[in-house]
Amino acid sequence: MLVQASNGNTSIKLEGILWIKGSGKWLARANQEEILIPIELAEAKETVEQGGEIAPRQISTNVRMRPSIETAMHAVLPHRVVIHVHSINTIAWAIRSDGIEELAARLRGLHWQWIPYAPSGIPLAREIELAVARAKETDVFILANHGLVVCGQDCAATEELLRAVERRLAISARPFPMPDSAVLGNIARFSGWQYPDHDSLHALGTDKAALKILKGGVLYPCQAIFLGLEAPTLPSTFAASKLKARLTGGEPPSFVVVERSGVMLNEKMTSAERATLIGLTEVVRRTAESAQLRYLTREEVAKVVNEGGRGYRDEAETQQRANSATAVEDIRTPREAEYTATRACPSGR
């Protein structure tokens, strides 16, 4: 799984223009709708140097999207083609305190660097600039507590590099005990909450290691943006008479983890929340209970949520009706999904 909901972004530089995914757009819809925005590359680089906000080039009255929050990172990279994904395999390594050491052997022979965690936008772009200055040949960047960036001079080569990294970092998902249908059925009866249609979600409640990891805190920004600052949990034994108030009082969460039983979903859960939860589940299923993890600090989480996180979430959720059938699709042919059409990457050249 390379992307979930509207996360991940791609770009291509053509004749001085940086074509970048619009904020809130879903890569899974790249063949069905316009998702790219044209940016003047020279102006974008200058804006990054000044620490300003990058604006789209107004070459069309139909451009109503904001550039991706990662536009600054794409602008400072010298490569013609850039693919940034939230690969569940990469993230499972990128959340580890010993991630650099663990990846050294797996990525041997590739030109890669580990980028310490930095908030998306100008701070992350600065870290990328420093990395490129250290080693200009770098074309694979592992973003701590975030994801993966691969780069190249043409679409085909960049796609193949992405696949190569995925093969090297692949981790088998840990099996999990079956959910307790009696307990979950009781929740549905008293609260109206829904049983997930994606069985792996139950691992968050039935797999001891997954639950422990989940309770530890926020592993990466999209988790906080779409799913909240902590996972809502219920003990395996609870008073059914108090259940409805627990799940519906105030602002109810989009999901609840029932310890040793499974997971239930709020009927109002959005496609973006669902896709993010599936991605989170697949990450923790690939993370060993004994792994030394590096969770985001309170300050880092607050910065994510308060500085653009809510707006990013709102933009992503405006796409939920169109994306209901493709919320968590893999990009099977990245050249197609990245650049919307052959117009942006003609014949893969």
What are these regions (language model features)?
Residues 342:
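Residues immediately within or flanking Cys/His clusters that coordinate Zn2+
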Residues 346-347:
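Short, intrinsically disordered C-terminal tails of secreted or membrane-associated proteins
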